């Protein structure tokens, strides 16, 4: 008995502590398992439920389901739109009131009141269906779906309700309208959750920002790709909804980029429009109308003063739908209308997706008041009219979300524990407490042993000074490693002091900002190995975007008209790309008359831009975001000449070998107002590199017109693009340069992508010919035609439409000295294009033999000579170029036409 007792005394309490550590190690995987309280659940419009880490925003898993809103894909007859956040209903157009209007009930309320009917004889039916599903919090795997037929023991027990509303009209056999709305069973979380974290989303896209409400610093961002409809947390074994604020995409970028953080003011229950006066801007509550694969939807959103709004009651198109005279639904007791009134667009626009006119930010609409739901009042609910009128203002919970004063928030103990230490639950805390007690006992034991043995060393006998120092360093590293992610890493310098930031071979001053982009991207002026560069800083979460952009830059930057890439460096929070430093953008070139242009004429700018684009297309790279802001001006070089480069490869797409199109599964690329129509049309086709040609056509007109857009003002720009209705008034003047430019721009802006020219064809267009090349072309054509019979196909094509080309009789439009000189040698037909070219060729060949008076009239060779004729006959060059296209493969005409593989070109527009 003595030996076992002695063995027990040898390792007590050290042996017991080691046994406990071994036991906890075996339980390690259970301690480290993901707990629901550590996750933030985000629902998106496509029906997916995403689980994010509350502290870092990392995506853990995604459960896919049916879309939140499913309705008509096209707004052709019925114009009912739904808000996926709460199921609110809006109607576009009634008999006497045009524009967007809000109905005083939601889809769930309409289902509760069904069956019911409106005063114009339209019957409403509704159906509600509840379901449960169970999700594994570790993997996101959906184990089963529960109905009333059975129960199971859940891990994450989530309820979802589906509401279906149908509208029937006895006067027509077809179903008038139907929609399906789904929402999670998640009551609003009590307390003030917004004081610890504030969540901001952008409408029309899936960008989610989580902000520290005390400092306004962005803790993390996550792009889910689809608009966010709800944010939830797990609290007391159930899903609870968290408030979030939806802002316009540009407004969200405006707030972040203007102050470097979300600087929103504290406020109470006042009007939203007046809350932001202290910010030198103004945010207004609007209604955003968007479109996803499941159909149109609406969402309340805050916008700043720079965002274009659709006015209240704006008539988008004349209505030719049926009349409903016997309607009792009234607006403010004066105007009458019905939510069942059919909305139709003009017959000329039905084939085109004119419903895109809806998309944008609308002023808050008026409310249609109706007695339809009073037949079946909803118990325990505020009246629909009262709730609808209050809904025009920002909910009070938003103002708590915007409260950014630094206070010591009183959090719920569960919330504070789960948010600060997402991996710890009640069992984990118990184990940690027990371990701490044992460690304390071990320390007391050592102290007692030290008191009993005065000669013992002060510290543990097996740790040297170096070992103790290493242990201290390891502990310090562990503290840094396990620092709360909500506390941003401190930079090694004070940004306000203007000291440079050095990351590898790149250095830059954070205060020297050159530009800002989407997704928190900044561009700084910096240095790379002694060379002045532009440093593009991207968020750490954008690693895939950085890698793709760098790969495309490395592959394409050997061309002088593509932005040059130098290197990439990675920091703890950001990625840094060193790029060629440019002096201005094309937008500044056009809109700033005082800007030094370094000898770059507008046509030279466009030619260099197309040269860079043709290089990208030859590498099977589609840029997908051409616009003036992405075309930069570099230089000047040693001769004082500038250079045009294409930049911003963030949306570029590398086409696989053997493919000429790309899909839109990852979203619609580009910038509104500069995107090709096929990117937005439904059903979507597989776009090709022709999308770049369309965007380039918009840029062409923007440059040649001095800043105008071919599709009008920004509010109606994308709708005009979809209708294929450009306004090229700035190029309508009957001059040589504008006639040639109009021909090219019109071809590049063709509605059908197959009708647009290739990049190689654009570069071969006469718009970019020098005066010497124009003169040589006319001479070569005239020489070639001398061998052709008068009634041959080539001469016939040249003489077709000659009446407009020679302006009835070209003899009448040349000077008297030249007329007299021409009559000295032979006769020329004034109505013949062939004879006009012959006269030009003869006078060019015998220029030195001409009388001084005639030479003075014609001007110097080649520029003055050719301009003498093209100014008098603006259509001559284009007409001749089209007529001679059948000879494009002849060696004499190869310099004037693109290669056969590049000859994609629509039929010539008849002039």
UniProtKB/Swiss-Prot annotation:
Cell location: Endoplasmic reticulum membrane
Membrane topology: Single-pass type I membrane protein
InterPro entries listed in its UniProt record: IRE1/2-like, KEN_dom, KEN_sf, Kinase-like_dom_sf, PQQ_b-propeller_rpt, Prot_kinase_dom, Quinoprotein_ADH-like_sf, Ser/Thr_kinase_AS
Residues that carry a glycan: 178
Post-translational modification: Autophosphorylated.
Catalysed reactions, semicolon-separated: L-seryl-[protein] + ATP = O-phospho-L-seryl-[protein] + ADP + H(+); L-threonyl-[protein] + ATP = O-phospho-L-threonyl-[protein] + ADP + H(+)
EC number: 2.7.11.1, 3.1.26.-
Catalytic residues of the enzyme: 625
Transmembrane portions of the chain: 427-447
GO MF annotation list: ATP binding; magnesium ion binding; protein serine kinase activity; protein serine/threonine kinase activity; RNA endonuclease activity
Cofactor: Mg(2+)
Chain sites annotated for binding ATP: 514-522, 536
Region of interest (Disordered), residue spans: 453-472, 479-504
Record entry for activity regulation: The kinase domain is activated by trans-autophosphorylation. Kinase activity is required for activation of the endoribonuclease domain.
Residue ranges, Cytoplasmic side: 448-911
Gene Ontology biological-process annotations: apoptotic chromosome condensation; intrinsic apoptotic signaling pathway in response to endoplasmic reticulum stress; IRE1-mediated unfolded protein response; mRNA processing; negative regulation of DNA-templated transcription; positive regulation of JUN kinase activity; protein phosphorylation; regulation of DNA-templated transcription
Main function: Role in expression of the DDIT3 transcription factor, required for the unfolded-protein response, growth arrest and apoptosis. Has no effect on 28S ribosomal RNA cleavage, unlike the corresponding human protein.
Family: Belongs to the protein kinase superfamily. Ser/Thr protein kinase family.
Protein name according to UniProt: Serine/threonine-protein kinase/endoribonuclease IRE2
Organism: Mus musculus
Name of the gene: Ern2
């Amino acid at each position: 008995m003595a030996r076992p007792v002695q063995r027990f005394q040898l390792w007590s309490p050290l042996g017991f502590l080691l046994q406990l550590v071994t036991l906890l190690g075996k339980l390690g995987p259970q301690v480290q398992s993901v707990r629901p309280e550590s996750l933030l659940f985000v629902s998106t419009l496509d029906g997916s439920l995403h689980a994010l880490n509350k502290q870092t925003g990392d995506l853990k898993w995604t459960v896919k389901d049916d879309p939140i809103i499913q309705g008509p894909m096209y707004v052709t007859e019925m114009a009912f739109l739904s808000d996926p956040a709460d199921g609110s209903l809006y109607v576009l157009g009634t008999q006497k009131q045009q524009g967007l209007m809000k109905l005083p009930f939601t889809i769930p309320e309409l289902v509760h009141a069904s069956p019911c009917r409106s005063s114009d004889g339209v019957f409403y039916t509704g159906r509600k269906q509840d379901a449960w599903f169970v999700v594994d919090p570790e993997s996101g795997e959906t184990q089963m779906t529960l109905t009333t037929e059975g129960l199971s023991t859940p891990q994450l027990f989530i309820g979802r309700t589906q509401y279906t509303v149908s509208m029937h009209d006895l006067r027509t056999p077809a179903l008038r309208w139907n929609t399906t709305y789904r929402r999670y069973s998640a009551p609003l979380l009590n307390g003030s959750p917004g004081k610890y974290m504030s969540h901001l989303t952008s409408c029309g896209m899936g960008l989610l920002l989580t902000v520290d409400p005390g400092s306004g610093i962005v803790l993390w961002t996550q792009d889910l790709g689809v608009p966010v409809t709800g944010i939830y947390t797990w609290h007391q074994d159930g899903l609870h909804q968290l408030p979030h604020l939806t802002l316009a995409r540009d407004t969200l970028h405006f707030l972040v980029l203007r102050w470097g953080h979300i600087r929103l003011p504290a406020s109470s229950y006042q009007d939203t429009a007046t809350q932001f006066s202290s910010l030198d801007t103004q945010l207004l509550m609007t209604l955003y109308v968007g479109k996803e694969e499941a159909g149109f939807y609406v969402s309340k959103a805050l916008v700043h003063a720079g965002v274009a709004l659709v006015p209240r009651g704006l008539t988008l198109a004349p209505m030719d739908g049926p009349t409903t005279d016997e309607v009792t639904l009234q607006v403010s007791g004066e105007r009458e209308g019905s939510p069942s009134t059919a909305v139709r667009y003009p017959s000329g626009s039905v084939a085109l997706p004119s419903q895109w006119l809806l998309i944008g930010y609308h002023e808050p609409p008026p409310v249609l008041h109706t007695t339809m739901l009073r037949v079946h009042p909803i118990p325990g609910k505020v009246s629909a009219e009262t709730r609808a009128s209050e809904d025009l203002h920002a909910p009070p919970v938003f103002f708590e979300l915007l409260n950014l004063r630094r206070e010591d928030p009183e959090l719920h103990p569960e919330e504070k524990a789960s948010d600060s230490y997402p991996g710890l639950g009640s069992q984990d805390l118990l184990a940690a407490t027990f371990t701490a007690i044992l460690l304390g006992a071990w320390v007391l034991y050592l102290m007692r042993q030290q008191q009993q043995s005065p000669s013992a060393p002060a510290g543990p006998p097996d740790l040297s000074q170096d070992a103790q120092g290493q242990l201290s360093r390891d502990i310090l590293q562990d503290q840094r490693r396990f620092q709360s992610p909500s506390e941003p890493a401190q930079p090694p310098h004070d940004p306000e002091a203007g000291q440079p930031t050095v990351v590898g071979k790149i250095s830059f001053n954070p205060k020297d900002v050159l530009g800002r982009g989407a997704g928190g991207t900044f561009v700084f002026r910096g240095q790379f190995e002694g060379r002045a560069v532009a440093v593009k800083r991207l968020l750490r979460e954008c690693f895939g975007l950085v890698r793709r952009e760098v790969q495309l830059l490395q592959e394409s930057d050997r061309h002088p008209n593509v932005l040059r890439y130098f290197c990439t460096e990675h920091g703890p929070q950001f990625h840094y790309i060193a790029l060629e430093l440019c002096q201005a953008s094309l937008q500044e070139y056009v809109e700033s008359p005082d800007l030094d242009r370094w000898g770059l004429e507008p046509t030279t700018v466009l030619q260099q831009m197309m040269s860079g684009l043709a290089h990208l297309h030859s590498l099977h790279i589609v840029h997908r975001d051409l616009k003036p802001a992405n075309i930069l001006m570099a230089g000047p070089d040693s001769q004082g000449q500038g250079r045009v480069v294409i930049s911003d490869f963030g949306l570029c797409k590398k086409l696989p070998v053997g493919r000429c199109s790309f899909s839109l599964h990852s979203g619609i690329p580009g910038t509104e107002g500069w995107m090709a129509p096929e990117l937005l049309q439904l059903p979507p086709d597989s776009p090709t590199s022709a999308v770049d040609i369309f965007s380039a056509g918009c840029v062409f007109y923007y440059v040649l017109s001095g800043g105008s857009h071919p599709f009008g003002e920004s509010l109606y720009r994308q709708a005009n693009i979809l209708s294929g209705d450009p306004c090229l008034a700035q190029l309508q003047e009957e001059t040589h340069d504008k006639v040639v430019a109009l021909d090219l721009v019109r071809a590049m802006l063709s509605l059908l992508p197959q009708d647009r020219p290739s990049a190689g064809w654009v570069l071969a267009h006469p718009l970019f010919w020098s005066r010497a090349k124009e003169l040589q072309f006319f001479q070569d054509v005239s020489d070639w035609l001398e061998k052709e019979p008068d009634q041959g196909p080539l001469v016939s094509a040249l003489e077709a439409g000659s009446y407009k080309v020679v302006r009835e009789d070209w003899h009448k439009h040349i000077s008297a000295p030249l007329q007299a000189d021409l009559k000295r040698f032979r006769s020329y037909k004034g109505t013949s294009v062939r004879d006009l070219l012959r006269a030009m060729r003869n006078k060019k060949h015998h220029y030195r033999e001409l009388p001084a008076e005639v030479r003075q009239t014609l001007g110097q060779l080649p520029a003055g000579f050719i301009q003498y004729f093209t100014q008098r006959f603006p259509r001559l060059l284009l007409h001749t170029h089209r007529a001679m296209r059948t000879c494009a493969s002849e060696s004499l005409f190869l310099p004037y036409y693109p290669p056969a593989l590049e000859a994609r070109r629509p039929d010539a527009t008849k002039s």
